Amino acid sequence: MNEPPPKRQSVFAKGMKKLQRSKSLLNFAEQAKPPTPENFSSLDPKSNLNSIGLSLVGYGLSSDHLPPPRLDTDSESVSSRTSSPTLHVTTKFNPKQRVESFQTATNFKNQIPPEEIVDQLFEKLLSIRVFPDEAVYSLKKQPVERKWELLLREHETNHHFDLKKLSEQATDKFLTNRDRFQEHEFLIMSRSTTQEPKPKLKPLRIVSGGEDYDDEETPTVTKLVHDDSSTSKLSIESGGSSGAPTETESLLGLVNKKLKIRDGSPDWYVSRIMANKLSLKDCKKLERKLVENNVVKNSGVTWTQGFINAQGETALSVVLTKINKKSIKSNEEFDKEYLIVKCLKHINSEKRDETSSLKEKVYVVKALVFLLVSPRLTTRILVTEVLVMLMLLRDKTLWKSALDGLSSLQDRNGDYVIFQPWLNAFEETIIKYSWSQNKAGELSNLKNYATITLILINSMVDMCSSLKRRISIRRDFGNARILNIFEKLAQIEDTRIDNEIEKYEMYAEEDYNEYVEGKKKRNSKQLPNIPQSKLKLLQVSDFVTTPEANTSLEEDELTPELEDNLSGTESSFDEKSFMTKLKEAEDIESDGAMKSVLQRLMKLKQSERSTEDVHKMLVLVDSMLQHVTNESRVIGTDAHSVLNITIQKLMDRLSTEDMARRAVAESKMLSRQLELVKEEKELLEKELETNKIETIRELKKENYYQAELIATQERQLSKLQQKIEQLQSPNNTALPVVDVGQQGFGNGTVASLKDTSSSSPSKRPPTPPGLYSMQKGSLRGGISAPPMLDFKDARPVSDLQDSRPVSDLQDAPRLVESSAPPLPESKDPVAQPPPPESKDSVAPPPPPVPDFIKSAAPPPPPLPGFMNASAPPPPPVPEFIKSSAPPPPPLPGFITTTPPPPPPLPGFITTTPPPPPMPGMLQPGKVKELGTLFKEKHKQEPQKGITKTKADVVPSIRPKNKLKQMHWDKLENIEKTFWNNLEDSVLSNKLIEQGVLGEVEQVFAAKTATIKKKTAVESQQQPTKKSFLSRDLSQQFGINLHMFANLSEEKLVLKVLRCNSEILENHSVLEFFNNEALVELSDSLFRNLAPYSTDPRTRKKPMKNPEELERADRIFLELCYNLRHYWRSRSRALLFSQTYKKDYIDLMRKLNIVDEANAALKKSESLQNVLGIIRTVGNFMNDDAKQALGFKLDTLQRLKFMKDDQNSMTFLHYIEKIVRHSFPEYGSFVDDLNVLSTLHNISIEQLETDCEEMSRSVKNITDSLERGKLSNKKDLHPEDRILTTISSPMLNAKNKNAMLQSHLKRTAGELNSLMTFFGENPKDATARNTFFYKFVTFITEYKKAHVENIQREEEQRTYEIRKKILEDKIAKKEKLKEESAEPEAVVDTAEESSAVIDSLLEKLKSSTPITTNRAKTKNRRSKALSFYSENPLEIVADTKYESVNNLKRRMTTRKRTTDGETSPKSEQFMSRAQAMLHQLRNKEE
């Protein structure tokens, strides 16, 4: 079928046959079982569980944490699959059959699919295996039968390699694209032996970051594959470094032998790195090779360049990432990572084409970022130097990779700020080395570390060319407490450190000033106007980020940049349509997610949802994208936290927008009111400009006269009423009372007087019984209006009183009592009273008072009965009324006789009488003339012999507002005193004219609180309802049911009974219905609600109307009281049916975590060995009587309390040191038991109790439904739908409860077995609850001891190095001193010695103390720096000694400050000079 292969292929085939015969690769005929891990580790199903079925054939490099491979398929081909059975490979081969051996595989030779399908499947297999280029090329030349055998074996050993699914996909793709597929396969898989196509090298993707980098591009290693779009990404996996040689190792050795890879060459080192066989010694050799950088023979390139071309840099980053994932590292791993970083530093120092190596450096940056928190200070310094070198390349992709790596580090540590883990380690190092005992030896390392770290910080900030980005990253640094670090670094007093801090603060101040200026410009300028032509060119594609635009990452939102972009030519706008760009980006991986997002948005737009719902969803998506692109680094890359924070910020923004919307509406309303006020003001100003001022003054004066007349009438009425009371005797017959409304005395009053005067005493009917009591009640209570009065145009007295200006009441004349002459009759029909009834008729009872009169001001007192037509005549007119005074102005004609005087007013009205309206008979034009006549009459006839009343001495005007009251001793009888002779009216008028009373009203005003009382109408409309519930329970009803406040009691009760979705979804309401207070009824409450209750079983009606009850009582009655025979069962069942799913998921999650912890503890042999080491060392230390075969877990808590003889190291530190130095493989138990960290919030006892509670609830509710209170439907309310609502959920709950109890039983059994395995008592509740906690505490303390030991050893190693350098320097000086036998210069004379001393003193005096501008700079920039840390995060110190160290630092700072104030440096120099002078003089003596 195929032409014979070339010679090179036959040589390789021979090697394959040898491997077959050695049973190492292909011969499975004699094996009864599938390959074991020892023989074929890459196909071990157990290893596939960790490595997701992918092997690095030939490279033994572990990828336990790497994601599974992506077997990309053509979705279009799958969707276009036809239904014909002949199109599927399954008609020839059934992949479900197990392939147990090679013999079984040979039985399927006759079931091979077409050659094209096999070739495509074999390409898929090669895409998940890593072979050298020549091996891949040779394997492609194998026959179809051989390829099929390898495919069957892979299907058997790798459960992720689903041959059936892949066959169907390949078949569909082949049939739908037959022509293109055949042409493509002819070019790639040609069988021609005459001309071999040159292999095409294509980058192979290696997922190296596990979960941290699963969304990023992967590093590349050169691999020979055909350029097929279906080729998936590849992963690197370890084949192991121990055991028998695997298939891949044998194949790699054979290929290396044929290719003659020379030992020590760059390719050889790369192959060793990828095979995970690079030892520490090899790392040192590699570092030496990179330092020497010799030219490679026969290549013309340097050794470093050859290593780079072989993708050694990427391979080193993969190994470094693998080491970084370990929590506990051995000393060899610490040394190896340090050497790898040194190698990467040498590689980055090599000059080469930076654009081609940019992708490789991305993964180098991500691997290096995790070492910024390494326990070793030397490693951190070196890593920071390499990162600074990479940042100096000023590539935005590297900058973004560094931020992504820091975000992954943040997520791993569980911090809240992206730079927090890094700067926390930085700050701890500063605090530790600042107080180190060997301060002189460690200070240089600290200064170097601080300087290079500050350079890196400034470089990362400087990489942001956008102001917005710089502000954002500075805020992140500020939240990570960088200003506190600056304060600590300032105490070191190093010039380099101060310069870097100065640089950071100076640039921060400049950015702050630029931000403030830009904000002012944006607030003052309007948005630029976009031309219509350019607006048409803006399409959706202009807002889609392309891969090229991703490298920029700088999107400044400043207005000037927007104007620059819009001011460009039209050619700058991309005219391609969105779909065109989307189609071009189909093959680009980064656009796949973009395409998916946009397709979902289009699907949402085309859905049947309403426009409002679509708009809300688009707003949420937009807010989330904005948060992810701009601010997600603050909280890391966790999807749940990003979503939660996005939704929270959106809700805050919406609430803020709602408040702003209300404020805008309110401002608009106030603006309209302001415009109306301005218009009114303009009208008033126009009136003032005209010549109407005099007219206004005259009108005001007339108003004053009218008001004065009204006051005079009030006084006159008061006097007449008092006189009538004096003339009445106790035996007189009571007069009938007729109530008068608030109109006062108008035309109707005059008409009544006319009728009264013309009636005779014989026509009066007898006085009705009870009239005296009625008269008293009329004066105090409401007023009834007779039918003769017309109230159509009536106004309350308060309106007239308010409309009367006080200032106008100054010169009003008083109304003098006189007899009115006859007047012509009036023809006014309204004023005419009704004719009197028959002479025998009796006065009718007063009609009911109208509503509008009840709510008005206090009415005037009722007039006597002579106003009624059938009332008795009044008493004779007093003598002082009969006078010869001039007649008053003519009255209306209907008054023909002299009217009788009105009755006096009651005493309570004379104090503050409300003024009645002006009589209708008085016209404004005649007021002045009438007042003049009254004044003249008043002067001609003074009053004598009459005792003054209160109405005489009270001023004619009363204050509008209440004044402070005078407290004096009143005289009731002033007949024989001077008070009776005073002219009160003259004095009062004079006070009014001079404005004294107005001034008194302003000066002595009293502040009174307005009490708003309910009117009688309101009390009738809202009758008081009854309430029997306690106040707390009523409040609980209002709080828990506040969302249904708009519903009536009947609708709410029906909603509850019908199990409305609003009730079911509100769990707080369901929990409230299960409150004991709603079920337990007191005796008094039972008796009070019994008359209002009904029973749904008997259908009886309530004795009283339930509407009399308050809202809470009515709801309680209808639900809790009337349904009390099954309300408890109903509420419990309803709540459980709505919450059991959530509880079930939560309990199953906790049980799964416990299962994982059980499995991890039982499988961790490293933990058992560490415990064995502890027991062995402890038995060695103990006497014979304390020898132990084992120990309980409580012993682990006491390891940190035993210290060595110097109290510098605990027993736990020593155990960690033993494990790390002698048993480094056992240190992996920390990573093996990482799942225990999720158990700290889970209590085993509480978990079992919750599971039992759920089982008990299911049982009780089921019993209620089957034979309990919910079983009989007749006992339920007719509208109650509880049975239909909970029947289906309870059936599902029973099944889930059975699964939960089974899982609990299995988990409890495994836990009991595990506790017994570790020597604990499963029946002890305390031991059961603290079982996992003991391991968690031990692991935490062990990790802490590991870090402390590493740092202590590094310090000791640094100390030894410096000590050796110092000793060598001293020895060298001694040796030079011995060799040079020259005598020392001796000062012979005292003059020379004194000259030396004087010179020394001059130098000391001339030296000035070192000063810095730190304080001045800090004050100048404090405002700018506070801008970047407006909301600093209070970060808890990781070490318990930090607070003590801070206290020491503050005390030392205070001491230094005190010393600086008392002893300046110049004085210290003088003291030292004096001491030296004293010593020299003593030597001379």
Curated annotation (Swiss-Prot):
PROSITE patterns on file: FH2, GBD_FH3
Locations listed in the record: Bud neck; Cell septum
SUPFAM superfamilies, alphabetized: ARM repeat, Formin homology 2 domain (FH2 domain)
Comp. bias (Acidic residues): 553-564
A molecular-function term among this protein's GO annotations: actin filament binding
Residue stretches making up the FH2 domain: 953-1368
Stretches the record annotates as Disordered: 65-88, 226-248, 549-575, 746-874, 1447-1471
Pfam families hit by this protein: Drf_FH3 (PF06367), Drf_GBD (PF06371), FH2 (PF02181)
Domain (GBD/FH3) ranges: 110-636
Coiled coil: 660-734, 1240-1312, 1351-1382
GO biological process: actin filament bundle assembly; mitotic actomyosin contractile ring assembly; septum digestion after cytokinesis
Record SMART domains: Drf_FH3, Drf_GBD, FH2
Composition-biased stretches (Polar residues): 231-248
Entry similarity comment: Belongs to the formin homology family. BNI1 subfamily.
Role according to the record: May organize microtubules by mediating spindle positioning and movement in the budding process. Required for cytokinesis and the maintenance of polarized hyphal growth.
Known partners and oligomeric status: Interacts with IQG1.
Name listed for the protein in its UniProt record: Formin BNR1
Organism, scientific name: Candida albicans (strain SC5314 / ATCC MYA-2876)
